[in-house]
Swiss-Prot record:
Protein name stated in the entry: DNA-binding protein creA
Function: Involved in carbon catabolite repression. Represses the transcription of a number of genes by binding to a GC-rich region in their promoter.
One GO biological process term: carbon catabolite repression of transcription from RNA polymerase II promoter by glucose
InterPro entries: creA/MIG_C2H2-ZnF, Znf_C2H2_sf, Znf_C2H2_type
Lineage: Eukaryota, Fungi, Dikarya, Ascomycota, Pezizomycotina
Biased composition (Basic and acidic residues): 271-280
Annotated Low complexity bias: 21-42, 131-140, 403-416
Keywords linked to the UniProt accession: DNA-binding, Metal-binding, Nucleus, Repeat, Repressor, Transcription, Transcription regulation, Zinc, Zinc-finger
Species of origin: Cochliobolus carbonum
Region (Disordered): 1-67, 109-140, 152-190, 231-250, 262-331, 353-430
SMART domains according to UniProt: ZnF_C2H2 (SM00355)
Ranges annotated as C2H2-type zinc finger: 68-90, 96-120
GO cellular component: cytoplasm; nucleus
Length: 430
């Protein structure tokens, strides 16, 4: 033992740094051992407390009354909203609908709707990205076809950002797995629309890394909608196709609703080629004003052989003839006679506003006026002549007013006078 201690002392003299480190380690060991023992003791004491804690909270919870019982099963609940939520599991009621455009899902609980809405609000979520993409595309196309919005305007809030490139071994024509696309695809509305929208999906997959990846899918969607408009399956006449390609001011995009507000139904009822194309027959029945099936400009060839003209009170249909225009307020209209007009006069009489008249209006009959007019009096150069004439009152005697015949125009005064006399007579008798 002495030799070992002497050797260690000699080593400490040669290496003083290692000697100081050994002393520090020896001092730390006794201090660390009590801290470890204290931690183990606290964990051993906390373990039974943690195990007993939920038991203490559950015992009074089970003792609470459950007044709300399910009428369909034996379960009872503490709160009414819990019972209502449970009954929906039996009835299948789903009152909470998703408000995202294009999404038709409904839920029986509000927390399920909140969890589902995170899929739409978070564009980076992997779950449901394909369904979100297809639903937004379907909603945008439906809005364009219904005429509610133009294809190139504000589609960013309707469409999610394009997905990342997907590596797959399937052919390029298949855009994804069958369960990603919605069950109600676009083929039930128009044949071949998926081919037009294929460019939009491919553009969204290929241009996602570029900064213009959001703008390009919008342009592709607008082009697909314009190609759908010019498809011969939706155009039931050759002249309509000619006008669409030549006269149409919007060659690369769909027109707005305001462009054809009064001419959205170009074909008359008696001359339509609905029997030539079954798709046009189906779409003309369900089309609305401004829809793609009826946005072509009106053509005179559609109604030239129409026997029954379109009524004037339907402004959305183009009639076979020009509407009959008559002055709107013809009672105040005073036109000079033709003989009083000359070519040297620069005065042009102002006409009343012209509007299409209905069939119930009577034809215009100018009223014969006698005497001077206010315009003639004001236009006289002399100031003394600019006076209104004294109104001419028919000279009738008082006896004629009281005892005149009933057809003289004073029957009402006669009746009132006789009534007043009778009243005075009765008052005198009393």
């Amino acid at each position: 033992m002495q030799s070992n201690s002497a050797s260690t002392g000699f080593a400490n003299l040669l290496n003083p740094e290692t000697a100081s480190q050994n002393q520090q380690q020896q001092q730390q060991q006794p201090t660390s051992t009590p801290t470890a023992s204290m931690a183990a003791a606290t964990v051993s004491l906390m373990a039974p407390l943690l195990q007993n804690a939920p038991q203490q909270t559950e015992e009074p919870r089970q003792d609470l009354p459950r007044p709300y019982k399910c009428p369909l099963c034996d379960k009872a609940f503490h709160r009414l909203e819990h019972q209502t939520r449970h009954i929906r599991t039996h009835t299948g009621e789903k009152p909470h609908a998703c408000t995202f455009p294009g999404c038709t899902k409904r839920f029986s609980r509000s927390d399920e709707l909140t969890r589902h809405s995170r899929i739409h609000n978070n564009p980076n979520s992997r779950r449901g990205k394909g369904q979100q993409h297809a639903a937004a595309t379907q909603a945008a196309v439906a809005a364009v076809q219904a005429g509610l919005m133009e294809p190139g305007s504000n589609l960013a809030h309707m469409m999610p950002p394009p997905s990342k490139p997907i590596s797959r071994s399937a052919p390029g024509s298949q855009l994804g797995s069958p369960n990603v696309s919605p069950p109600h695809s676009f083929s039930n509305y128009s044949p071949g629309m998926s081919n037009d929208l294929a460019a939009y999906h491919q553009g969204g997959l290929s241009n996602s890394s570029s900064p213009s990846g959001l703008a390009r899918p919008m342009d592709l969607l607008a082009d697909a909608a314009s190609r759908l408009e010019q498809r011969p399956g939706h155009i039931s006449h050759s002249s309509r196709h000619h006008l669409t390609s030549g006269y149409h001011p919007y060659a690369n995009r769909l027109p707005g609703l305001s462009q054809y507000a009064y001419s959205s139904q170009p074909m008359s009822r008696s001359h339509s080629h609905e029997d030539d194309d079954p798709y046009s027959h189906r779409m003309t029945k369900k089309s609305r004003p401004g829809s793609p099936s009826s946005t072509a400009p009106p053509s005179p060839t559609f109604s030239h052989d129409s026997c029954s003209p379109t009524p004037d009170h339907t402004p959305l249909a183009t009639p076979a003839h020009s509407p009959r225009l008559r002055p709107h307020g013809f009672s105040d209209l005073q036109l000079p006679h033709l003989r009083h007009l000359s070519l040297n006069q620069n005065f042009v009489p102002a006409l009343a506003p012209m509007e299409p008249s209905t069939e119930r209006e009577q034809p215009y009959v100018p009223s014969q006026s006698s005497g001077l007019r206010i315009g003639d009096i004001i236009s006289k150069p002399e100031g003394a002549q600019r006076k209104l004439p004294v109104p001419q009152v028919p000279k009738v005697a008082v006896q004629d007013l009281l005892n005149g015949p009933s057809n003289s125009g004073f029957s009402s005064g006669n009746n009132s006078a006789t009534a007043s006399l009778a009243g005075e007579d009765l008052s005198n008798r009393n």
